[in-house]
């Protein structure tokens, strides 16, 4: 879940947390999220985080003039699937 509900939960060793920030400055809109590991995490979590980042980077490489959204999403999905993962198909994407 990207957008959690505030609670009294205290982070502990092995947790991961996603920080999602947006900004509007001088007519420009930005949005970014990053996942942080809290202390030592399990190897499978590290692997997931590595593939997530690599999938993002694959998509960014395809975000060039002349390409379409499908080119970007294909690169993301291909990288994720190469690691045995899948992509979320609902509740994704938004405009800024």
Model-derived features: positions:
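Active-site neighborhoods and metal-handling regions in enzymes and metal-associated proteins
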Residues: 1-96
């Amino acid at each position: 879940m990207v957008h959690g509900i505030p609670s009294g939960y205290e982070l502990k060793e092995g947790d991961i947390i996603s920080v999602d920030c947006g900004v509007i400055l001088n007519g420009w809109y930005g949005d970014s999220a990053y996942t942080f590991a809290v202390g030592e995490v399990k190897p499978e979590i590290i692997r997931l985080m590595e593939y997530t980042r690599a999938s993002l980077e694959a998509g960014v490489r395809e975000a060039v003039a002349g390409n379409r959204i499908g080119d970007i999403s294909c690169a993301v999905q291909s990288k994720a699937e190469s690691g045995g993962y899948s992509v979320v198909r609902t509740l994704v994407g938004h405009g800024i």
